[in-house]
Amino acid sequence: MAPAADGGVWYTAQRTGRLGWLDPESGRVREIPLGAGSSPHGVIVGPDDAAWVTDSGLNAILRVDPDDDVVTRYPLPAEAAGANLNTAAFDRNGVLWFTGQAGWYGRVDPASGQVDAFRAPRGTGPYGITATPDGDIYFASLAGSYLGQVDIGSGEVTVLEPPTAGAGVRRAWSDSKGRIWVAEWNAGQVGVYDPSDGSWREWRLPGDSPQPYAVYVDELDVVWLTEFTADAIVRFDPLTATFRSFAPPSVPSAVRQLLGRPGEVWGAESAADRLVVVRYAAAD
């Protein structure tokens, strides 16, 4: 799911091949069919205010116009068949980058329609992806247990190893300073990589055998995660190194993605087919 430019919230309905839009004020929903065989995974809002969808069923990136619901399809090259598309982010040039869990990452240039796919280091695993405020791109490899720094010109990747071996870097998000926060699924930790000096720090989440899945950093540089063992949304304050947990309304909830806008963090409860929001005091 992803907060939309018009105040609504986009979400993917993976089992029915649709993109949905929710009006949080009225509860009104509209759903847009994406085509036969569609299985949408992630959705983000692009610089054009359109919804951009990673569709593993169609093995394509989709653009959905927010005004007329027209769907434009950008198929992956034949060599990247079965890429198992996951997540996307836009770089500073307006180019969309995507991950495919079957061992792929790539880009779509909306201006030309060109689609490129690259084999990822260590094969299977590319999962979450993020852009920094400067438009640099990093992706997380769950199976590969690394953070990948993408050269947006050449498409080449530099592998960045977290201090904990086999950490299982699942999702990633940039803060306002360009530091990359990661959810370490195997290690039960949240980590941060600072490109300015190449340093890492890690903190273990509270509870027994924590499994952090999604990560999002709000406009205050507070870090939000989802934790599957406790079935909770977790707030981490880097300034005090303290955690606070919130129980979603649904049990089980299994929140697999977090995104937000000032004052709100939105999550998709995959086990309940619901969206959840945590509201907080936003920056002035």
In which residue ranges do the predicted regions lie?
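Beta-rich, blade/repeat-based domains predominating
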Residues: 1-6, 35-48, 79-93, 99, ...
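Beta-strand-rich domains and repeat architectures in extracellular enzymes and scaffolds
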Residues: 1-17
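Conserved beta-strand positions in repeat-built beta-propeller and related beta-rich domains
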Residues: 10-15, 51-59, 96-102, 138-143, ...
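A short loop-to-beta-strand structural motif that recurs across blades of beta-propeller domains
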Residues: 18-20, 59-63, 103-107, 146-149, ...
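Short loop/turn segments that connect beta-strands within beta-propeller blades
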Residues: 23-27, 65-69, 109-113, 151-155, ...
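A short beta-strand motif characteristic of beta-propeller blades
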Residues: 28-33, 70-77, 114-119, 156-162, ...
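Solenoidal tandem-repeat scaffolds enriched in leucines and small polar residues
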Residues: 83-90, 96-152, 157-160, 167
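Blade-level signature of beta-propeller repeat domains, shared across WD40, Kelch, NHL, RCC1
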Residues: 248-284
